[in-house]
Amino acid sequence: MEIVFVSENENKITEAREILLPLGFQPIFCGVTCRETGLTFTENAVLKAQAAVGSVKDVPIMADDSGICVDALNGMPGVLSSRWSQDGRNIDLLLWQMRDVPDVHRTAHFVCSIACVMPNTEVRTVSSVWHGRILHVPDGTGGFGYDPVFLPDGYSVSAAGLGSDLKNRISHRYKALRLMSSLLKRTYSSCHA
């Protein structure tokens, strides 16, 4: 099944391709500039997907908004994750803010919300989380964003150290894309039954 995936983030595009192809989707990528003015990940994902509606017809349009929520920071950076620091040094700022937080209070989770605008303009949304902790120093060379400082529950290496094959089978983005793919497959199978 062909879908449009809206993103200007090359790392998200790579992950989405690696996740969606085995799920049976042929993603077409569309870069649309959209101000993220929503108060939630879901609101921002909907804004991004709707921004691409005029660009394509008769194909579901999917968009992602995701970020990290740190319990010791009252859920921040949250929807501000990609623009947490003014100079793009998001990890440095996060680690500085967490410098005195003991291990027991370094819990965090990634959130990924996926919005899909159907050809009939109906909007579907799903969200998923990936629980873990914030490390004291970056670890690993893979991934992107906050991956080097996120230690997923049940693992001994950061998300950046997992390798893309494993990360793309357990991450928040994988879980959300899997949920959306199931929803789309059910929708299309019932329409064509």
UniProtKB/Swiss-Prot annotation:
Family from the record: Belongs to the HAM1 NTPase family.
GO cellular component labels: cytosol
UniProt GO BP: nucleotide metabolic process; purine nucleoside triphosphate catabolic process
Catalytic site positions: 65 (proton acceptor)
EC main group: hydrolase
Cofactor requirements of the protein: Mg(2+)
Protein's name according to its UniProt entry: dITP/XTP pyrophosphatase
Catalysed conversion reaction: XTP + H2O = XMP + diphosphate + H(+); dITP + H2O = dIMP + diphosphate + H(+); ITP + H2O = IMP + diphosphate + H(+)
The protein's Enzyme Commission number: 3.6.1.66
Pfam families on file: Ham1p_like
GO molecular function: dITP diphosphatase activity; ITP diphosphatase activity; metal ion binding; nucleotide binding; ribonucleoside triphosphate phosphatase activity; XTP diphosphatase activity
Binding site for substrate: 7-12, 66, 144-147, 167, 172-173
Free-text cofactor note: Binds 1 Mg(2+) ion per subunit.
Record lineage: Bacteria, Bacillati, Actinomycetota, Actinomycetes, Micrococcales
Assigned keywords, A-Z: Hydrolase, Magnesium, Metal-binding, Nucleotide metabolism, Nucleotide-binding
Protein source organism: Tropheryma whipplei (strain TW08/27) (Whipple's bacillus)
Record function comment: Pyrophosphatase that catalyzes the hydrolysis of nucleoside triphosphates to their monophosphate derivatives, with a high preference for the non-canonical purine nucleotides XTP (xanthosine triphosphate), dITP (deoxyinosine triphosphate) and ITP. Seems to function as a house-cleaning enzyme that removes non-canonical purine nucleotides from the nucleotide pool, thus preventing their incorporation into DNA/RNA and avoiding chromosomal lesions.
Binding site for Mg(2+): 65
Endpoints of the signal sequence: none
Complex formation: Homodimer.
Ranges that cross the membrane: none
